[in-house]
């Protein structure tokens, strides 16, 4: 009963026979009675009336992989055998025959007429944006109220293979203590200007903390500004005693300067030297090398300094210029000839005639009486 009902339901089903062949697809044969794969093909023009559940189904062909020996010896059939190692001649590449692009070919990749620009790490400062101006050496600008414009108040530097942090907020008013003064001679021989008048006052409550961070700032600035040989111009004029750096601070600066910087220092010019700075250098002789002492020069005026170095990019503080003007004025006044003052004589004493000692001639009678 169930088989008859299933047969009636399948009478209206259109069943098409599919060819499952591993070969390339080809059109189905139109003629009946053609043997394919060794068996007669039935005419499929009319749909079948029954389903053949017990008939033989056509099977797919199964490809058998060849036996491959995966051993590492060069036996027959292994991966290292000569059959697998042989390659066609056209795949052999000679490395020496490969052409490498030259500099002209490399420039072809630059479009829109842009030229290749070479950049180096050499610090070049201009007079418009010198270190110590509104933009400091590290590019960390701060606002007038002391807050950082870019949110950074600290700068990490490496000095002597050790990492240090600089409190930029505390040393912001004193960053002009070290500036770049251009170059001298041929090459990149830098002029580093150290203005002592911008040092902090020793009466400040955080004086030692400020000097500690300012010391790191000065040393890291030398590392940043110096490319080859350099000289330091120390502006000592217009600096009161309370702003003078101590001997310990100067000694620490000298000891932590890299050996390359100490070797490349060609001259230390001290402008307007005072007795205090001379005394400090005299006391510092035990821990300062003789070569460093020989590099020190004393200059007593800016005019003399101009004879030694170019002054186009050297920034002289206003207080130093005023100090120089006062010194020149005092020098001119001291060189001016003074008028001679003659004391007036109130009473003239009468001249006294000299007394002549004239002896009277002795007569013969007087000689006789004396005898």
Swiss-Prot record:
Function: Functions in the development of neural tissues, particularly the postnatal maturation of the cerebellar cortex. May play a role in neurotransmission through regulation of glutaminase/GLS, an enzyme responsible for the production in neurons of the glutamate neurotransmitter. Alternatively, may regulate the localization of mitochondria within axons and dendrites.
Alphabetized PROSITE patterns for the sequence: CRAL_TRIO (PS50191)
Region Disordered: start-end pairs: 1-54, 331-371
Name recorded for this polypeptide: Caytaxin
Comp. bias intervals (Polar residues): 42-53
Transmembrane parts of this sequence: none
Start and end residues of each CRAL-TRIO domain: 171-328
GO CC entries: axon; cytoplasm; dendrite; growth cone; mitochondrial membrane; neuron projection; presynapse; synapse
Post-translational modification remark: Cleaved by CASP3 and CASP7. The potential C-terminal product released by CASP3 cleavage may inhibit the ERK signaling pathway through MAP2K2. May be ubiquitinated by STUB1.
Domain notes: The CRAL-TRIO domain is known to bind small hydrophobic molecules.
Encoding gene per record: ATCAY
Disulfide-bonded cysteines: none
Organism of origin: Macaca fascicularis (Crab-eating macaque)
Pfam families: BNIP2 (PF12496), CRAL_TRIO_2 (PF13716)
UniProt main location, coarse: other
Compositional bias annotation for Basic and acidic residues: 11-29
An example Gene Ontology biological process: protein localization to synapse
PANTHER family given in the database record: BNIP - RELATED, CAYTAXIN
